[in-house]
Amino acid sequence: MNSMFCSELQQALPQMSEDVAVTAQTILNGTPPHNHFRKEWLAGAAGTTTPTTTSGGQMMTLSPPAGDGPGSAGSMAPESTSSLSDLSGDAEGVWSIDIDQAFQEALAIYPPCGRRKIIISDEGKMYGRNELIARYIKLRCGKTRTRKQVSSHIQVLARKKLRDEQAKKKGDIPSLLQQASPPGGVKSPSAVVFPPVSAAVAAITEISPQSSYSSIVPKVETDQISQQLFKSLPLWSFQQTPGLPIGMDLSQLVFQQSSPDKTVSPVKSEVVEETKPIASSQLTLHSFSAYVKCNKTSLRTELVKIENTLEKDDIDISVFYEKYPKLLRELFEKSEKKDVFFLAKCWANINVSDDVQNCQYAVDSFYSSREKFQLKVSTMACSFGNQAVEKIEQYFPIEFDGSYSFILNNSPMCDYMVKFIAELKKLNVIETMNNVLENFTVLQIVTNSETDELLMVLCFVFEVSQEPEPSCSVYRLIDGGGDSDE
């Protein structure tokens, strides 16, 4: 690159300090069709929070993500329109030739620097590498790419490179979606070794109100829900392999105990194989099921299902921090009990009726404890690490044979989730659905309603199942010494 262009770049950088952003109000007032929103997320959305509404024991809050943080300076109407046209229509991992060329040039100019910042001498300000690349693309092509889109594009290219390398070694490797498999097929060798933990805690829920309460959800159209969930890109640098969650290779994160040589018959090995319950010293999750029941035929279709089995692998919680609100990290760092944090990777079955009006979307869940208390369950749907909606439910104990059960059957799923599922189905292509689900998570926090003692925290990630039945793998989240901050 000649010196003249470098000089032009340095002069223009100070003028590009504001990322193009769109406020939540703008998004809700006018959203593109569902087939466009995959690439129309914008960082730095100036979030507006709707007032919290309460009724009985249930609370629902709809609050758009806070955006890109201090680096964003709000939205400018002329650039917002330009940005939408700039960012729409790109396939996953595919940018136009001019943008990709500028992207490659910027990669060469700005070498990887980890979480460190690069100082622009003329400005005296510090910038992350991805932000500088985004600014360079804007200067070079006049088209907007946010720093998070740059981060995502880098990761997409890295995953493609990995798949190409694997294909050369192993031949034709089926795609991620073709090998999405039940929990038994998720196990893989370890690249990061953590000591196994004997006891485990977990819990799971969908966004679902208690059956005795009415659902309180703001009136939001389906396209608005889609746009609500896609305003920015996550910061990930993990590689994708078949059948593993949220575009990540869990084999890079988990420890799997080496199993002895199988010298016994399959029947005997099944008998001696030890399974771990999803439980802690205070609370046990026995089962969870989110389902759709047709009122006309009484046919019940399971969307998500968890059984009382914990995987033997442990995963570093820090790699998931940016998938969830900051509350997750705060809870983990402050909690004296580190055994109450879990990840549930769910392969969901969305082959359900499109007749939403004549179908019941509901949740069944069953917990137990040897202690008597009331459970408070806070469940948040999150998009790109930011809370979108929250629901709070109450579970009351039922004493039986010296223990206490917490049962909630036929609890209606909230309108937000019903509309999200309907909108997701419109994408038709499973791979596209999974790309969407990479940025959608659910966080459940279970506490003692009287003392606020933390009992369980479960982080949900989702993928569309290729099988007719849903499945799930639950892992313990531990402190692996990592840090996902940029």
UniProtKB/Swiss-Prot annotation:
What compartments host this protein? Nucleus
Give the region (Disordered) as residue ranges: 47-87, 165-188
Q: Which InterPro entries match?
A: TEA/ATTS_dom, TEA/ATTS_sf, TEC1_TEAD_TF, TEF_metazoa, YBD
Swapping R140Q leads to an effect described as: In n998, n1087 and cas6; two-fold reduction in mRNA levels. Production of an extra neuron from the Q lineage and a mild egg-laying defect
Would the keyword Nucleus turn up in this protein's UniProt record?
yes
Q: Where is the composition biased (Low complexity)?
A: 47-57
Q: Which Pfam families match?
A: TEA, YBD
Q: Which residues bind DNA?
A: 88-164
Q: Which residues form a coiled coil?
A: none
What is the predominant subcellular site recorded for this chain? nucleus
This entry carries the following GO cellular component terms, namely: nucleus; RNA polymerase II transcription regulator complex; transcription regulator complex
Name the keywords, alphabetized: Cell cycle, Developmental protein, Differentiation, DNA-binding, Neurogenesis, Nucleus, Transcription, Transcription regulation
Q: Which GO terms describe its molecular function?
A: DNA-binding transcription factor activity, RNA polymerase II-specific; RNA polymerase II cis-regulatory region sequence-specific DNA binding; RNA polymerase II-specific DNA-binding transcription factor binding; transcription coactivator binding
What's any GO biological process attached to this entry?
regulation of gene expression
Expression (tissue specificity)? Expressed in HSN neurons in embryos and in the FLP neurons from the L1 stage through to adults. Not expressed in touch cells. Also expressed in larval hypodermis, intestine, pharyngeal muscle and other neurons. In adults expression is lost from some neurons, is weaker in the hypodermis but remains in the intestine. Expressed in HOB neuron, ray neurons RnA and RnB, and the ray structural cell, Rnst; rays are male-specific genital sensilla (simple sense organs).
| Known role | Transcription factor. Binds to DNA sequence motif 5'-CATNNNNAAATGCAT-3' as a heterodimer with egl-46. Represses expression of genes involved in differentiation of touch receptor neurons (TRN), probably acting as a heterodimer with egl-46, perhaps by occupying similar cis-regulatory elements as an unc-86/mec-3 heterodimer. Plays a role in cell fate specification of neurons, including the hook neuron HOB, and touch receptor neurons.
What assembly does the database describe for this protein? Interacts (via N-terminus) with egl-46 (via C-terminus); the interaction is direct; the interaction may regulate transcription. Interacts with yap-1 (via WW domain); the interaction may regulate transcription.
Q: Name the chain's protein.
A: Transcription enhancer factor-like protein egl-44
Organism for this UniProt entry: Caenorhabditis elegans
